[in-house]
């Protein structure tokens, strides 16, 4: 009987990818804060393209001293292109083993601008050990639904007329980011106070979603 391998996703290895750089930056900080439970670790950001020796020196070197550290690798070179030769392929496999052996005091975060091609061997292998999260801009047609859910999570209910108003206004924008919608949601909740229902009048009174902003 064949035994199927089970993926072991590491709690201290994350991949953030997508075309919303603002959200990637915010999520990166949130992940670091949550992983270390509010403690402030030493954070190292390694710019693209990087190399295995550089990555290894920070991941392994910091672990030896048992210092709480977060190593952020931006647009790692192996994500965008396949190994040049067998030597580089072996280096990649060795790098994956380093990730698997990280101590809990070290958090590894990869950030990728744009789409992550999950068909490549490098992406598949990395995703087999690291948790991933897409951080992309929203289509205008999604905006009203997203902010309505945010408001619902805050205990608010969007009235039908207000929902139609949001769909009309947000639908005219070119691009939308989740952080911007979250900011708008926070403002609406503040203006609503103890009121559960969110009306069109309240949105207009708060000067929220009143005019189309520049693309975000």
Each language-model region and where it sits:
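Pre-Walker A adenine-sensing motif
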Residues: 2-5
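Conserved small/polar residues in nucleotide/adenosyl-binding loops
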Residues: 210-216
């Amino acid at each position: 009987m064949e035994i199927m391998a089970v993926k072991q996703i590491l709690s201290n290895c994350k991949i953030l990818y997508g075309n919303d750089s603002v959200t990637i930056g915010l999520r990166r900080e949130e992940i670091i804060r949550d992983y270390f439970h509010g403690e402030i670790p030493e954070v190292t950001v390694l710019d693209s393209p990087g190399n295995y020796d550089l990555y290894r020196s920070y991941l392994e070197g910091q672990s030896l001293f048992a210092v709480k550290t977060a190593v952020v690798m931006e647009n790692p070179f192996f994500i965008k292109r396949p190994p040049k030769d067998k030597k580089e392929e072996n280096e990649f496999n060795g790098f994956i083993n380093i990730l698997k052996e990280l101590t809990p005091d070290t958090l590894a975060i990869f950030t990728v601008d744009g789409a992550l091609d999950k068909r490549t061997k490098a992406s598949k292998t990395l995703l087999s050990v690291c948790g991933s999260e897409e951080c992309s801009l929203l289509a205008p047609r999604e905006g009203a639904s997203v902010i309505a859910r945010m408001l619902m999570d805050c205990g608010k209910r969007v009235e039908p007329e207000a929902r139609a108003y949001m769909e009309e206004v947000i639908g005219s924008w070119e691009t939308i980011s989740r952080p911007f919608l979250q900011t708008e949601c926070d403002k609406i909740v503040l203006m609503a106070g103890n009121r559960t229902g969110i009306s069109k009048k309240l949105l207009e009174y708060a000067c929220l979603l009143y005019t189309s902003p520049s693309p975000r």
